[in-house]
Amino acid sequence: MKKIFFTILFFATVFDLVAGDWPQWRGPNHDGISRETGLLQAWPSAGPKRVWLSRDIGIGYSAPVVAGGRLFVMGTKDGKEQLFAKEAKGGKTLWTATLGGILSNNWGDGPRGAATVDGDKVYALGA
């Protein structure tokens, strides 16, 4: 839960500042490098401003992706793995889709993958 919270907090903060999409794991060029300019060179002494907080995603290790003003992340809800679509700027849940049962193992429960956005389609596989 903490991992998802801090990951979303980080991406929500970053994507509030930049305009580019990050439509899949490791970004648009599959290399983990943002081509955006004008980014902060250091965090403010009080840390980054929290843009929004989501407590409805549950557990998991999914990396969020951002495309077209929407943030997609996988988590758990009602005993199932879910794909959550949220407004990137405000965090409002737009929709959810059930992916299947929750993966339970010795390495931590919940989904591990990241969704991929291609045009107007979103692809996601559960853990």
Task: For each feature predicted by the language model, list its residue ranges.
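Sec-dependent N-terminal signal peptides
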Residues: 4-13
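Noncatalytic, solvent-exposed loop/strand surfaces
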Residues: 19-127
